[in-house]
């Protein structure tokens, strides 16, 4: 009995010695980790000026050396009901959840793929057709090549798919129209390629819709259930979900987006289009109408604290605390620059040349990577400076500047705050 007890203790000690324990985030003052606090806090007045000028809200969090050194919210989670300014708008707080838009691609789809690659359940050189039966060239297709498309081609955005086929809008989509997830995959299979695969990079939502379906094929689970149960829950994330209103959250916890549904202040129309102020539902049309709110390209909601944990996972090389999702080799594989375009990794956007200055500014290291989201979100992860920045906003929660000229430009989008790189540079410029 005594020998057994000793052996058990030794075995437990031996196993614990090999257990991976990753850094977890703690708070620190900016000065403790190399910032000039006075310079950093100059951002406060500038951002408030942007709010006063009409930018709806900004939530900002900065990580340096495993510490949260700045976390603050400005503006309003909801200030309009339709075109009417609320007498008592709802202020944004650091707990406000935001529609991440295309940051979904990284923190749902890419995280899932990185985990599956690490576990050996998928290889990025696998053919797409291995996981999606019937994914092949169609009779009459002018550009061929679907049969040979690999997952890595999809991740690099070189697969040939159009940027935005607008499946839910029958006037635009035509025969590819779909407002049901059950038919959307079939419409994607029928979507003709617009350019020869591998000939250039065209950022496409379709690519990540496909990747979402691949994840569901491998895991035999809906995408939201897979990431919420195998990634977010183990990490202790409380506010990172798809379809938040179906999962216990209420509108006042979430930042509102477009004032008149998806109509761009009344100039866009299609069957079943939403016309009320969007509040707790994903803004993206394909995600909402064609995918039921859960898609590989859009649909995820989160707050700055949860996003900070996910960015720290990347800085840590794949884990957080006692949770390991993937390894540093996988992180390197997915963030490595594409040989054809230095601004693309596997999904991740990389600070590969001056074209990324509006995103990452001019002071972040060339190894910085991250993503943006159409609703006004940015994530920037800098492994050289061991820094990460998340900006969450609800840019579409303002009138359209000139609906008849360009329905996709909102008044808030004309303000300097809409250019993330300026904010990023002020943060880097505050380093001693």
Swiss-Prot record:
Q: Which InterPro entries match?
A: Beta-lactam-related, Beta-lactam/transpept-like, Diverse_Enzym_Activities, Pept_S12_YfeW/YbbE-like
**Where in the cell does this protein reside?**
Cell inner membrane
Swiss-Prot/TrEMBL GO biological process terms: proteolysis
Task: Quickly give the catalysed reaction.
Answer: Preferential cleavage: (Ac)2-L-Lys-D-Ala-|-D-Ala. Also transpeptidation of peptidyl-alanyl moieties that are N-acyl substituents of D-alanine
Question: What SUPFAM superfamilies does the record tag this protein with?
Answer: beta-lactamase/transpeptidase-like
Which parts of the chain span the membrane according to its record? 7-25
Membrane topology type, per the record? Answer: Single-pass membrane protein
GO molecular function per UniProt: serine-type D-Ala-D-Ala carboxypeptidase activity
User: What GO terms fall under cellular component here?
Assistant: plasma membrane
EC numbers, comma separated: 3.4.16.4
State whether keyword Transmembrane helix applies: yes
Protein family: Belongs to the peptidase S12 family. YfeW subfamily.
- What is the protein's name according to its record? Putative D-alanyl-D-alanine carboxypeptidase
Supply the source organism for this entry: Salmonella typhi
């Amino acid at each position: 009995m005594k020998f057994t007890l000793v052996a058990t203790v030794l075995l437990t000690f031996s196993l614990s010695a090999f257990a991976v324990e990753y850094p977890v985030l703690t708070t620190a003052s900016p000065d403790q980790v190399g910032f000039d606090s006075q310079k950093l806090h100059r951002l406060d007045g500038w951002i408030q000026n942007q709010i006063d000028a009409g930018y709806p809200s900004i939530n900002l969090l900065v990580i340096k050396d495993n510490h949260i050194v700045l976390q603050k919210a400005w503006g309003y989670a909801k200030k309009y009901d339709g075109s009417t300014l609320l007498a008592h708008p709802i202020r944004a707080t650091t707990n406000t959840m935001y529609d991440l838009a295309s940051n979904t691609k990284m923190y749902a789809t890419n995280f899932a793929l990185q985990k599956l690659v690490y576990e050996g359940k998928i290889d990025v050189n696998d053919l797409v057709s291995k996981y999606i039966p019937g994914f092949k060239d169609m009779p009459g297709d002018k550009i061929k090549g679907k049969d040979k498309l690999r997952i890595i081609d999809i991740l690099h955005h070189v697969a040939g798919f159009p940027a935005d086929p607008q499946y839910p809008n029958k006037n635009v989509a035509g025969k590819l129209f779909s407002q049901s997830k059950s038919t959307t995959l079939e419409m994607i299979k029928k979507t003709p390629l617009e350019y020869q695969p591998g000939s250039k990079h065209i950022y496409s939502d379709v690519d990540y819709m496909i990747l979402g379906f691949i994840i569901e094929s491998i895991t035999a689970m809906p995408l939201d259930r897979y990431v919420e149960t195998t990634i977010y829950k183990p990490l202790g994330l409380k506010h990172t979900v798809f379809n938040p209103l179906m999962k216990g959250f209420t509108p006042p916890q979430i930042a509102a987006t477009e004032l008149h549904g998806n109509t761009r202040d009344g100039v866009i129309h299609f069957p079943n289009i939403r016309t009320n102020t969007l509040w707790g539902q994903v803004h993206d049309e394909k995600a909402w109408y064609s995918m039921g709110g859960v898609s590989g390209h859009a649909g995820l909601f989160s707050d700055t604290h949860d996003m900070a944990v996910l960015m720290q996972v990347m800085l840590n090389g794949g884990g957080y605390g006692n949770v390991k999702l993937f390894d540093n080799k996988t992180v390197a594989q997915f963030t490595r620059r594409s040989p054809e375009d230095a601004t693309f990794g596997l999904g991740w956007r990389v600070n590969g040349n001056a074209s990324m200055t509006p995103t990452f500014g001019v002071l972040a290291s060339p190894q910085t990577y991250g993503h943006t989201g159409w609703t006004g979100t940015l994530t920037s992860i800098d492994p050289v400076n061991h820094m990460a920045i998340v900006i969450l906003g609800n840019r579409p929660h303002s009138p359209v500047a000139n609906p008849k000229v360009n329905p996709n430009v909102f008044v808030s989008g004309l303000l300097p705050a809409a250019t993330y790189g300026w904010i990023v540079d002020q943060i880097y410029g505050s380093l001693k």
